[in-house]
Amino acid sequence: SLHDALPIFETHPIYDDFTTPTFDDRHNLIKGGSWVSTGNEAEPESRYAFRRHFFQHAGFRYVLTDTPVASQTSRYEADELVTQYMEFHYGAEYWDVPNFPRALARLAVDAVGHGPHRRAMDLGCAVGRAVFELARHFDEVVGVDFSARFIDQGVALARGDTVRYTVAEEGELVQYKAAKLADLGLSDTAARVQFWQGDACNLKPQFTGYDLILAANLIDRLYDPARFLHGVHERLNMGGTLVIASPYTWLVEHTPRDKWLGGFKKDGESWRTLDALKALLGTHFQMVGQPRELPFVIRETQHKFQHTLSEVTVWKRTH
């Protein structure tokens, strides 16, 4: 049978647990002793996990099944960017900085105020924490991201799965971690969410009629952010709320230089992203209040963290 942990299982930070790597859908639990085993594993009632191609038990039993063996991927997500964002969204808080997706979702809900709370969309949702947070307050929430790897994590969590991932400690050393909505108090409203892979600059027509659109740390990662901003009003109901958060870290790897919204000289004057937002959104939106800064921390290794301030602006659709 497949090998997995009990729901209450947790690794101890001090104990070097050698069982967690076997929770990967590649190990089978084999009952009985093994001729190469000593100690507890040699007992008749022992249980231990072995990869299917190991030959320790070749002389004991041979089982042939008519059921095709499905090829399984590792249950532990190891993609560096995905694991960083899993920890960013669902892991521990560092340096007394509150969880960013949760804090931003609460800010967005407050910005909507007494307006309709029917439908919301999180554009650039990554692995989905803000989507689940918004689902506590909206009847339907859609998370859209360009990366299928990110979306897969949100889909698995919404399904009720435990998503296991590793975080880098030092060199090749990693720590095994897991995320589950029930542990965060988010499972009761998970049925309200949907995840879609999509391009914020070229959204399908179905993504319309929202009371709230959240664009978190998105615009400075788009290949044509002005195109997105020119058309975003078409996705919102009249009177709907648009919340944009960004550290404005413009990089040519993500956005061609001629598509940057700000961070350069224009007509001899400093032109900032906020100036561009006001110019591009002014026809259909009114900015509510003043911009505010929301901090976030992304863990890279045990001793290396990114500490960033994201500027948050709130806009109401007026035309």
Residue ranges and their predicted role:
Residues S1-P68:
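Surface-exposed recognition segments
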Residues W95-H117:
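Conserved alpha-helix/loop element of class I SAM-dependent methyltransferases that forms part
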Residues S147:
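Conserved SAM/SAH-binding beta-strand->alpha-helix loop
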Residues R159-C201:
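S-adenosyl-L-methionine
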Residues E170, T255-Q290:
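Conserved Class I S-adenosyl-L-methionine
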Residues C201-I213:
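A short acidic, Gly/Pro-enriched loop at the edge of an enzyme's catalytic core
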Residues A226-M238:
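A short glycine-rich, Lys/Arg-flanked "PGG" loop and its adjoining helix->strand segment in the class I
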Residues G239-P247:
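Conserved beta-strand signature within the Rossmann-like core of class I S-adenosyl-L-methionine
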